[in-house]
Amino acid sequence: FNSVAHTSDNSSVEINYIKMAIANSILIKRHMKNNQVCLVTDSNGKKYLEKQDKLYHFDHVVVQDKQYKGKGPNDNLVVNTRAMRNGTDTIRLPWQNQSRPDAYKLSPYDKTILLDSDYFVFDDILDKLFDTDYNVLCGAHVGEVSQQGTLIDYKRLHHQTIKMYWATVLYFTKSYEAELLFKIMNSVKTNWQYYGKLYKFASKTYRNDFALSIAIHMLRAKQEVFKTYELPFKIMCVADKNIMTSNNAFVFRKGDTWAGSSFPTQNVHVMNKQSAMEISERVCNG
């Protein structure tokens, strides 16, 4: 839940996903009416919450320690790592993302919205999902607020294969359909190398977005027009090339100069982890 990376000038960057989750819980309870929050973390994460006296921010805390079975996705089957930009620097961070396919059995709720801890909730649009008749909804469209479309990695897993869906925001109910989705995701995770060859992606690092995309493809009877599982809005993100200067403003390097802008306050996935930490500090400190 906590890691330290070093930038090109040898300064350190502490990334604490528990602190991001605390900030998000505060925001969810501030902006949403459906605001029960369950945190899934490992034993160290819960110990941190207890030591900091921060358990009260969550209605439930579910402990799941790292586990992995199957071939791939990495030489190290416990810790994924991923290179991420931090403005003009590149850092490599541990990437603990392999418990997401277990969310169906871990959730204590009949209706759940599964969020990345760095997807910050600044409005109530997610409340609308609880009023739908769908059993599964996820991100099909992503918008990058700086309008640098090349910063978004994929529209398809491979140009010859299937449409990309994003696991950043995933709504599901306790239903046969949702349970099947997560079973397929677990199968993809366990057999990562096989599915990589089948769907022509080269990622050695396990990605929930890819596993979700394959599961949606199968639920749709392998047809892109058979049934929709798409959220009724874009997932807005700020790419890691951008540095957030407030909750709704950013700057980025353009040639030899810096440029930037602000945007309407809204839910946003902050991919620059140092910026996500700074937002978390602002929220937690009032």
Task: Specify the residue positions occupied by each region the protein language model found.
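A glycosyltransferase accessory/donor-loop signature
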Residues: 1-6, 11-13, 17-23, 39, ...
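Short, acidic, metal-binding catalytic loop of nucleotide-sugar glycosyltransferases
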Residues: 27-34
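A residue-level signal for conserved active-site and pocket-lining positions in enzyme catalytic cores
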Residues: 28, 104, 118, 170, ...
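Residues at the starts of beta-strands that form the adenosine-phosphate
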Residues: 36-37, 111
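Short, polar loop motifs at secondary-structure junctions
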Residues: 41-47, 66-67, 120-124
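Active-site-proximal specificity loops/subdomain of glycosyltransferases
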Residues: 46-107
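GT-A fold catalytic core of metal-dependent nucleotide-sugar glycosyltransferases
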Residues: 96-148
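Conserved catalytic core of nucleotide-sugar-dependent glycosyltransferases
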Residues: 127-191
